[in-house]
Amino acid sequence: MNYMRIIFKKFKARMIVGCILAVIALLAVSVIVFINQASFGRTPRGERLERVMKSPNYRNGEFKNQHETLLMTSDRGRFSGIWEFIFRKIDGLRPEQAVKAIKTDLRKIGRNEEILVWFGHSSYLIQTGGKRILVDPVFCMASPVSFVNKPFKGTELYTPDDMPDIDYLVISHDHWDHLDYNTVKKLKDRIGAVICPLGVGEHFEYWGFDKERLIELDWNEDCLLYTSPSPRDLSTS
C-alpha cells in the first residue's frame, strides 16, 4: 500500500510539473504570436539598417538623445515607478460626462482654405497652401490591446473614412498612440507621401507602402513640402 502511495505521489508531482510547464509553454507561444502581429511592424533591415547604423545619433544598438535626459526623477526604482503608474488611482483622471465636440465634414472643405483640426493628443490635420498634412492620426487603437488607452467618450468622432485625400502623412515616432496600424492601413491608398523618423519607414514598407512614398529623416534633417504659392520647409529637431 505504501509503495502504491509513493508511486501515486510521484505521478501526481509529475502531473503538476507537467501542467505548469504546459501553461508556461502556452503563454510563451501566445506572447510570440501576439508580438508577431503585423500591427507591431518590423525592425529595420538591409539598406535602411545600414543608414540607421551610420547615423551619428545611433550608438550601442540604439538611438541616443543628443542631450542627457533623466528618465526617472524620483527616488523610487523603475519597477515601483511603473507599478504606481499603472495601478495608482487618480480622481478626476477621466471626464464623467462625454466631452463636447463638433464633427466637421472634412471632405467638403475646399483646398484653398487654411485650416487646422485637432483630433486629440497629437493627432491633427493641417491644410495650407493647397496641401493636406495629417499628423500622427489615431482613429482606431492607441495601444496593442483594446482595453488600454481608450478614448474619452465624445472624442471618438472621426474615423479614417472621414479623412479627405492626404498629401503628406507625418509620423513623429512609432509609439502606439502616435502610429496606429489600422488607421494608416485604411488610409494607405489616399496618402501621397509619408514623412517619418529614420527607421520607422520599415513599418510602412512592411505594411505595403511603396518605398518611393517614404521620406525618412534623422534629427536635424529637413525636407521641402511643395505647397502653393511657395515650398515650405519641414525640419526635425
What positions do the PLM features span?
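Metallo-beta-lactamase
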Residues: 3-143, 148-150
